[in-house]
């Protein structure tokens, strides 16, 4: 039954993802008793995985590296950028073994919010724009849809003042700043705001006011 049929809602065109496989630039995993995987829905039963078909191949390749860290129990987040460089973020009481990270293009490892190898950020690129992304900063997980979103923004907000709420590293703020007079960008995570200020400078944007704080305030 279509419960929305009584409402006069215009047709919405859904933008299809160009690639159905190997497109996500981030994954969050569990390590339980030395095994890497996801929790089964509504349980704490671990489903061990060897591959995740919706995340980038560079992330899948790094699974081997993560398993070789010899961790028994941990939360692990893996992020990869346009150049297939990889950041690994670990929450664990154990110290990981680090073996041949260069073979997997690992540029940084963060353990309990402390960088223990390489750097705690990397550079992301979409179209002709560059973005510094810290290990705990929000960045959209689908770069293809990001590009489509950028184009949609440019087409619909020319000449206006824009509020970018929960703005992360300033991705949408920077895109909007190219076609509007002023952007107010609000984000609660300090690292993300720090990234956003750098990103505005990299992309030569001087009409964005970055605000550190809660949107609700």
Where on the chain are the PLM-derived regions?
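Generic beta-strand structural signal
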Residues: 31-33, 80, 125-126
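N-terminal auxiliary segments of SAM/dcSAM-dependent transferases
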Residues: 62-118
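A short catalytic or substrate-binding loop motif that flags glycine-/basic-rich loops and adjacent residues
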Residues: 19-23, 81, 116, 131
